[in-house]
Amino acid sequence: MRASGAVLTLLLATWGTSAAEPDENDSYFPIWGDEARARGYSIPLPYGVNLSYMNIRQDIMVDSITFSGLKLGNHPIPSDMFAIDAGHTREKSKTENLRLDMWVFPFLNVYGLVGHTRGSSVSQVSVDSDPSQFRGLDRAIAGAVHQLYQSGKLQDIDFKLDFKGTTWGAGFTLAGGYGNWFGLVDTNYTRTDFDILDGSISAVTVSPRVGYRFSFQGIDGPSHLSLWVGSMYQDVQQEFKGDLADLHMPPELQPLIAAVNKDGEGKFDVKQKLTSPWNMLIGAQYEVTKNFNVLTEFGFNDRNSFFVSGEYRF
C-alpha cells in the first residue's frame, strides 16, 4: 500500500530563456539569480506555498501476512500455523499536502511537506495449514483449517485493510532549460505514520520530466503554459501491524478468528510493496499571474494517479 504514499511532490520550474523579461526581486535567494536573469533566463520567485491533492490507484505485491498471539482456550497457537497466501491486491489512497519551498540556486529548489493520507487495499487471500508440521492439539487445529481450505471456504477471500495517518517529508528539485524547453528531476522522501494501526509507509520517489513552455499575454501581463511528459520511480516499503480485533474481517474468516482470539490479544503483520516501481506521467501548469499558478498531472500504466495543486510564489 502506498500513501502517500506516496505521495507525489511536484515542483515545476518555470525555467526558460526570455528575450527581455526583467524579473527583479529583492530577496537574497536564489543565489546567482541576478546572473541568471542577466543571461536572459526567467526564473521563479524564490519562495512558494503549495496546497495539493493526489489520488492514486495501484497494484500491490503482498510479501507476507502473519497472525500471532492466538489461543484456543489456554492453548497458544504457533504463529506459523496459518499459511496465508495473498493473490491480486489493489490499493487506493488520497493525500492532501501543504508544501513550503525555496529556490536556493536558480537550478536547485528544496522543500518540506506535511499532509494527511487515507486509503485502503483489498487482497484476495487463501488460508491453509499443513497438519504434518504439528503434533497434538496443534495438528488437530491445522487439520481443521486444511479441511476448510480444501472445501473452498478459505480460498480467494477479500481481505481489506483501511489506513489513515500523517504524511511528512522533504525533497529537492534540479531544473534547467534551453530556449522554451525545460527539464527537471524531482527527488523526495516521505513517510506516513498511521493514526490507528501500527506501522508506516516509507517512500523514496524520483521523477524526471521534460517539457515545453509556451508564452502568451495573460490576465496580468506575460504568462506561460507548460506541458511535459515524464516518469516516476518509487521505492515503497509498507508495513501494517495492529490488533486483529481492529480489523473488519471478511465473513469467511470471522468464525475462525473468533475461536482463536477470544481474549482480543491476537496481532497481525502485513508487509507489502509495489508490483511495478515505474509509471508514466503527463502534466500541465498554467501561470495565472506572476505569483499564482495551478498545476495538474496524470499518471498511468500499473499506477494510475491524478494530481492537482495551487501555488503562491513570492
Where would I find each of the regions flagged by the language model?
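Transmembrane beta-strands of outer-membrane beta-barrel proteins
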Residues: 47-52, 106, 110-112, 181-187, ...
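Outer membrane beta-barrel transmembrane domains
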Residues: 228-314
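Short glycine/proline- and aromatic-enriched beta-strand/turn motifs that initiate or cap beta-hairpins
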Residues: 19-92, 101-102
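Short loop/turn motifs that connect adjacent beta-strands in outer-membrane beta-barrel proteins
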Residues: 21, 37-45, 102-107, 176-183, ...
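Residues that define the transmembrane beta-barrel architecture of outer-membrane proteins
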Residues: 45, 92-96, 162-168, 200-206, ...
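Residues on the lipid-exposed face of transmembrane beta-strands in outer-membrane beta-barrel proteins
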Residues: 51, 98-106, 112, 170-176, ...
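Transmembrane beta-strands of outer-membrane beta-barrel pores
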Residues: 53-59, 114-120, 176-180, 187-193, ...
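Extracellular loop and loop/strand-boundary signature of outer-membrane beta-barrel proteins
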Residues: 36, 82-86, 153-160, 193-199, ...
